């Protein structure tokens, strides 16, 4: 597993812990603004992990495909993901 994937995995594990904490906050009847702030933090961690995975994809999968002469498929995949990100 390369460094980007290791970092993405750690970010996802952190987000999972944050989400578990958010669930507990809701169950405990905690203040809504505090819950909302934690949701933003978990969301940011998920976005970070996605960026790391896309970085890994560009640095390895897309580069390898381009060297083998079929990089346009991989580029189209990345454009599809970026379109989803920008539409939100």
Ranges and model annotations:
Residues 1-88:
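Solvent-exposed interaction patches of small proteins and small membrane subunits
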